[in-house]
């Protein structure tokens, strides 16, 4: 069997943060793009919220290609949610955030996955509407790990990537780079190119990389990754979880 860097992006860390830092937040609204990944995240969020005794007052799906969210947002607003959780891609969530402002929808917490991981989303909605929106990703260039391998630190990886390609790396590109680093480390550890020896070296690996801690479970999936939760504060991405790389605290209040 193979080795995989894929690890489900779950909603437990955001839910834990809200339950701990904002226990007064009880009413959750979920609006999900009707597509495999965004809908899976939304369903996990629903489970995670209910597990903590939160009241999911609204759960709706929107079709791929939706441009007008007015009806869904109006219905959501009527439920007076304290935490709005939306899933989709960059264009979806730029439009949604702007239309939330048009309807003067505000809440203590607004989480959007996965668009705020991209600078394009922050630029698209502007600093004012991005303020205090939270998100999560498998990895983000704002994280800070001091790792082994050819790149060493996250900062160095991001610097080298920007010098080569002229853009910020996202989690897809970083995971590809991490896979190369991990394979190199496994070959060095095995002292061989023999497939079985390299695989055994991978299976027993426990290292820190620019991507984060790397350790694999019996099923071949990475089980050490703590996907960062972050918040846009004053136009910048601030990591608020995990504690080992936390750069700031959760700020409440997302307005118009």
Q: Model segments located where?
A:
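Extracytosolic ligand-binding ectodomains
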Residues: 1-256
